[in-house]
């Protein structure tokens, strides 16, 4: 089946669109990437998304208008690739996350992804699966991360323990134990590790007065000095790093509010030193999760997402994990930039075939669930 996956991460850089040929289901799952492209949002739409994600108040009318505008952008992105690469049988659309509230104190969590699935189905004329997180949340789960259910079939190993580390706006991991014993599937874990590129990108935008949106290759940060005392304070004073999994987070915690809270301390540093320290914090937060919550350090970390291109960040990760091999998912057959969109395509494919898409051991849900609402063109 040819399936098109759509997703835009918390950084809202653009819409990732992947077309994949999918066969099999789990142990026999086969995914061949046929096409991939990231299609940028119109600047005004991206600005509105980032305002909402930062907590900017909206009326219900404004929120529904934004939902429709994002759906239009997603549908247009899908049609662009379909025109270039041929028809597809199914669309999976994650939408644009603008808020995520994990469950707490016995209350169900909730998560808001904009991009109306029914509108995408109507505009494209193709059955569309969307709203993937709500079924897991309704079962008491975090609703995130969902990608580990796909990672375990595409990136596991018979000979080594692996971590798949996505570094998007937020960092998240999938722990993949060696598959050479009968219970390995039940030991797969995954959760959000904390900041990915979110704090770095926001700081770059501020320090460059809007001229830059990210630190290309980490080159700016690499010229600075790390304020280890400040980095250690962030790690010690943030209770998220002491919270055991399952857990999830978002830009609500690691966004503008974080930078504003620590503005006095950051402003005492040069621009390069600020970026070096924020880069170290991102790397250290990932390693902190490994050391505190994994059964052992992985033999190999497979990195994906935009952070893969930040060489300074990867150097800091390697320095803190000297015995661990660090590679890209590209090296093991999964396109590192298309990986999230591929996963959404697989989740939609599973939903269409009534295969549960969550891992309760990962999300904390009380049981497996069919993920996503299905919208057929009427």
From Swiss-Prot:
GO molecular function, a single term: kinase activity
EC code(s) of this entry: 2.7.1.170
Pathway: Amino-sugar metabolism; 1,6-anhydro-N-acetylmuramate degradation; Cell wall biogenesis; peptidoglycan recycling
Keyword annotations from UniProtKB, A to Z: ATP-binding, Carbohydrate metabolism, Kinase, Nucleotide-binding, Transferase
Record's keyword annotation contains ATP-binding: yes
One BP term from GO: amino sugar metabolic process
Binding site for ATP: 9-16
Reaction equations catalysed: 1,6-anhydro-N-acetyl-beta-muramate + ATP + H2O = N-acetyl-D-muramate 6-phosphate + ADP + H(+)
Top-rank lineage group of the source organism: Bacteria
PANTHER family to which the protein is assigned, alphabetical: ANHYDRO-N-ACETYLMURAMIC ACID KINASE
Family, as annotated: Belongs to the anhydro-N-acetylmuramic acid kinase family.
Function: Catalyzes the specific phosphorylation of 1,6-anhydro-N-acetylmuramic acid (anhMurNAc) with the simultaneous cleavage of the 1,6-anhydro ring, generating MurNAc-6-P. Is required for the utilization of anhMurNAc either imported from the medium or derived from its own cell wall murein, and thus plays a role in cell wall recycling.
Name used for this protein in its record: Anhydro-N-acetylmuramic acid kinase
Organism: Synechococcus elongatus (strain ATCC 33912 / PCC 7942 / FACHB-805)
Organismal lineage: Bacteria, Bacillati, Cyanobacteriota, Cyanophyceae, Synechococcales
């Amino acid at each position: 089946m040819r399936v098109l996956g759509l997703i835009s991460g918390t950084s809202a850089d653009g819409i990732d669109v992947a077309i994949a040929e999918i066969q099999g289901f789990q142990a026999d799952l086969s995914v061949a990437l046929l096409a991939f492209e990231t299609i940028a949002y119109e600047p005004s739409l991206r600005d509105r998304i980032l305002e909402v994600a930062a907590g900017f108040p909206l009326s219900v009318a404004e929120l529904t208008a934004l939902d429709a505008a994002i759906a239009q952008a997603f549908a247009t992105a899908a049609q662009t690739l379909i025109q270039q690469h041929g028809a597809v049988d199914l669309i999976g659309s994650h939408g644009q996350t603008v808020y995520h509230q994990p469950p707490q104190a016995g209350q169900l969590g909730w998560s808001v992804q904009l991009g109306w699935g029914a509108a995408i189905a109507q505009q494209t004329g193709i059955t569309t699966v969307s709203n993937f997180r709500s079924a897991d949340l309704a079962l008491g789960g975090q609703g995130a991360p969902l990608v580990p259910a796909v990672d375990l079939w595409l990136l596991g190993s018979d000979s080594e323990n692996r971590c798949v580390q996505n570094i998007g706006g937020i960092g998240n991991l999938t722990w993949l134990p060696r598959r050479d014993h009968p219970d390995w599937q039940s030991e797969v874990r995954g959760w959000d590790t904390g900041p990915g590129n979110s704090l770095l990108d926001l700081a770059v935008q501020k320090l460059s007065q809007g001229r830059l949106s990210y630190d290309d290759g980490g080159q700016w940060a690499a010229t600075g000095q790390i304020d280890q005392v400040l980095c250690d304070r962030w790690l010690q004073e943030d209770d998220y790093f002491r919270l055991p999994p399952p857990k999830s987070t978002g830009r609500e915690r690691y966004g503008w509010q974080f930078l504003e809270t620590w503005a006095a301390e950051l402003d005492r540093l040069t621009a390069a030193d600020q970026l070096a320290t924020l880069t170290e914090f991102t790397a250290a937060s990932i390693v902190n999760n490994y050391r505190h919550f994994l059964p052992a350090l992985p033999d190999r970390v497979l990195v994906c997402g935009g952070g893969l291109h930040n060489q300074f960040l990867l150097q800091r990760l390697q320095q803190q994990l000297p015995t661990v091999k660090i590679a890209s998912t590209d090296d093991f057959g999964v396109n590192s930039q298309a990986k999230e969109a591929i996963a959404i395509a697989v989740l939609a494919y599973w939903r269409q075939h009534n295969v549960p898409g969550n891992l309760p051991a990962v999300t904390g849900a009380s049981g497996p669930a069919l993920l996503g609402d299905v919208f057929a063109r009427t």
